[in-house]
């Protein structure tokens, strides 16, 4: 008689707060992991972009150059460059090591909500409230975009460089007044979304059922980022960023 195969263990979801960063940049508009998950970027309403080691809570560098609040940022795949966009309608290319502005791209008619590099970090894609996506050549000195996509009928809130498709819609979280993030967990088993009710919602990707409503705090969870390979979640609320891990995780030196 053959025994049945054991049921695969389900993924562990981050439910334990292990670190809180007081970012000191006014309201944190976005938080983003770098490509390997060792560092994160925070975008502030005080016009700054900051680079952190999130598990240690260490501030590594502050980037100043925007004329208004910073709304999104992304790192290149080789960790040498950053790009950011903000309320000043500008897209900024940064050198990570020196903290200097390499290029400023202008052309959007409204605030820039979202930015992404292509895989080679030769092109920046930016999405704006002006309903356009613009592609900027990082290697050329030409000031105008190499391509403009203006078929959208409303403001662009998110741009992703991917070959994936939209699989399903998930309802239940509250989203009326703010541009809120959503992403996939590190094993692509759950859709994770911010909410205006102070919680982060985890939805089973296949079933579409709510797996977890994680209470973060009394405010709006405006942004989140999921570690690329580990059950580690960053959330942004007010002027701080919270780092969450699975229940079994033991932080070095304890939680703070």
Name each model-derived stretch.
Residues 3-9, 168-180, 187-189, 198, ...:
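Terminal intrinsically disordered, low-complexity extensions flanking WD-repeat/beta-propeller proteins
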Residues 42-46, 84-88, 127-130, 194-197, ...:
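Conserved strand-to-loop turn within each blade of WD40 beta-propeller repeats
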Residues 26-32, 68-75, 110-117, 154-161, ...:
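Canonical WD40 repeat/beta-propeller blade segments in eukaryotic WD-repeat proteins
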Residues 31, 49-52, 91-95, 115, ...:
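WD40-repeat beta-propellers
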Residues 35-36, 77-78, 119-120, 162-163, ...:
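Residue-level detector of Asp-centered blade-edge/turn motifs that repeat once per structural unit
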Residues 9-11, 17-23, 59-65, 101-107, ...:
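Short C-terminal beta-strands that terminate individual repeats in beta-propeller domains
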Residues 48, 67, 81, 90, ...:
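A conserved positional marker within WD40/Gbeta-like beta-propeller blades
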